[in-house]
């Protein structure tokens, strides 16, 4: 029955040649869905789960259209991996039904940071666009998390083993957890994404990162607006060749490399990352790099990272390197970080902090940071004269004089 219903909703594009569909041996009447077909989905309504028809269209159609004013009710998980030459034209919405017991038991799990997700999307040559909405229906999750701090909450969209992907002109609302996870991706672009997160109760929308990049190469994130409650963009282990530009981040924890080097025996690489033209407002951090130190941690390399053209407004820590992450001074001196940091540029960083300390570049002892350049800083604080702190690093650049001599531990 579901097949027949799904078929009835698959409209063949005018002008399509017969080669694209209409196999005479197919079980379909007339044109069955085949390569080149466009399928248009209509919500079943009455609380019926639309995930099966969306999955069916993903298997059978090259273009999947969700028209304006159509909200698909996604009540079961979406495994949309291994696709090829797919276009999801989302003008309407996908709303992820907040059935907490269902998702905590059935969300796709990832060992990395113990995450789960509603949706894995992967394969090759995939476009998701159309101006529509991914609605995480997060309020129920924010309220449940307030009562259960170990509650697993689903990421809206995980690009998993995805190559040559474009996500553009998409709104994301109230994710229960991270908004976008790029896991083992290559050549992925996000453009014109509008992320909004808010709570109508007293409970906060925790861990709602904009993007987390992991084991991925060649990722671009640009021209987007993010209003959330955790990292705006986070470069996790093995993020390489990344450009982030023209973002307006509000209320976040900033743009962050790391934390890296946490797990013994694991080597983390973050290399070739540029973040530029960033408006960062009401945030915990602006531009940040953090790496673990201590006795039982991992190792890695952070190399060629540029933070350029940051305009910051009311940011608690506008510029940060913390290479003694989660350790105190004694322990960091005994066990300096094995995640080396080199070739770092902070350039054209302007705006306001919230406390007097507007920059803190704290490296582990024993020369674990090298070639750190600071240029053209223009930061002030409403709390008094701006303080620039540095430790165990030789800074270069025209803003180095603001820092003066760095502490050696
Ligand atoms: C998703 O579906 C593919 C087959 O289509 C399967 O190989 C894969 O294991 C599934 N992934 C998960 C996480 O269930
Ligand atoms: C809290 O969440 C965890 C993880 O999702 C779950 O295993 C546990 O049962 C929940 N606890 C309660 C009291 O609901
Ligand atoms: C990268 O992906 C885009 C689609 O976003 C595609 O147009 C482009 O050809 C891909 N680049 C390479 C080198 O494959
Ligand atoms: C920006 O973030 C602040 C602090 O989190 C919040 O109070 C404010 O409403 C946000 N502004 C917008 C435009 O969303
Ligand atoms: C990162 O890449 C390196 C080199 O390929 C590899 O040895 C390491 O295990 C990777 N780390 C992670 C966290 O995947
Ligand atoms: C970083 O970029 C340089 C210059 O393009 C390139 O040679 C190097 O291979 C890149 N590193 C990684 C890890 O991709
Ligand atoms: C540094 O990374 C950027 C990408 O973020 C890349 O364009 C540039 O070539 C890299 N430079 C070096 C010296 O590797
Ligand atoms: C930073 O801003 C300056 C001045 O607006 C501009 O010339 C430069 O191209 C920008 N840098 C990047 C990497 O966008
Ligand atoms: C530093 O941390 C270590 C390990 O947690 C702890 O044993 C030690 O007491 C701490 N020292 C200070 C000065 O807080
Ligand atoms: C320094 O930053 C200011 C904005 O804070 C900008 O107008 C100016 O062009 C920058 N100077 C250089 C040399 O990049
Ligand atoms: C800073 O430079 C001096 C002189 O070259 C060198 O002795 C010292 O080890 C360097 N410090 C760090 C933290 O790299």
Regions found by a protein language model. Give the residues of each.
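Extracellular/periplasmic carbohydrate-active domains that bind, remodel
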Residues: 2-409
């Amino acid at each position: 029955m579901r097949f027949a219903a799904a078929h009835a909703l698959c409209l063949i594009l005018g002008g399509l040649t017969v080669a694209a569909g209409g196999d005479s041996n197919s079980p379909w009447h007339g044109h069955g869905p085949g390569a080149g077909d466009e399928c248009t989905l209509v919500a079943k309504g009455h609380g019926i789960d639309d995930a099966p028809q969306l999955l069916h269209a993903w298997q059978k159609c090259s273009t999947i259209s969700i028209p304006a004013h159509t909200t698909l009710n996604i009540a079961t998980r979406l495994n949309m991996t291994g696709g090829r030459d797919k276009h999801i034209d989302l003008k309407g919405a996908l709303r992820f039904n907040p059935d907490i017991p269902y998702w905590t038991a059935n969300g796709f799990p990832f060992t990395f940071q113990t995450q789960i997700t509603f949706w894995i999307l992967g394969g090759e040559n995939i476009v998701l666009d159309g101006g529509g909405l991914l609605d995480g229906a997060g309020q129920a999750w924010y309220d449940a998390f307030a009562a259960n701090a170990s509650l697993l909450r689903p990421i809206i969209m995980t690009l998993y083993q995805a190559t040559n992907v474009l996500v553009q002109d998409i709104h994301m609302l109230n994710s229960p957890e991270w908004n976008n996870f790029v896991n083992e991706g290559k050549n992925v672009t996000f453009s014109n994404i509008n992320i909004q997160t808010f709570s109508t109760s007293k409970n906060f929308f925790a861990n709602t990162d904009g993007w987390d990049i992991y084991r991925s190469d060649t990722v671009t994130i640009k021209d987007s607006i993010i209003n959330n409650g955790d990292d705006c963009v986070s470069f996790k282990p093995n993020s390489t060749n990344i450009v982030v530009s023209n973002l307006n981040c509000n209320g976040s924890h900033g743009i962050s490399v790391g934390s890296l080097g946490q797990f013994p025996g694991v080597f983390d690489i973050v290399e070739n990352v540029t973040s530029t033209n960033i408006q960062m407002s009401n945030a915990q951090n602006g531009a940040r790099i953090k790496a673990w130190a201590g006795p039982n941690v991992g190792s890695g390399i952070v190399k060629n990272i540029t933070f350029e053209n940051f305009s910051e407004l009311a940011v608690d820590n506008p510029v940060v390197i913390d290479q003694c992450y989660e350790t105190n001074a004694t322990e960091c001196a005994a066990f300096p970080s094995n995640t080396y940091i080199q070739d770092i540029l902070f350039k054209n960083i302007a705006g306001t902090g919230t406390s007097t300390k507007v920059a803190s570049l704290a490296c582990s002892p024993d020369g674990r940071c090298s070639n750190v350049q600071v240029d053209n800083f223009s930061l002030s604080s409403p709390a008094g004269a701006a303080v620039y702190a540095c430790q165990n690093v030789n800074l270069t650049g025209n803003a180095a004089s603001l820092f003066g001599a760095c502490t050696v531990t």
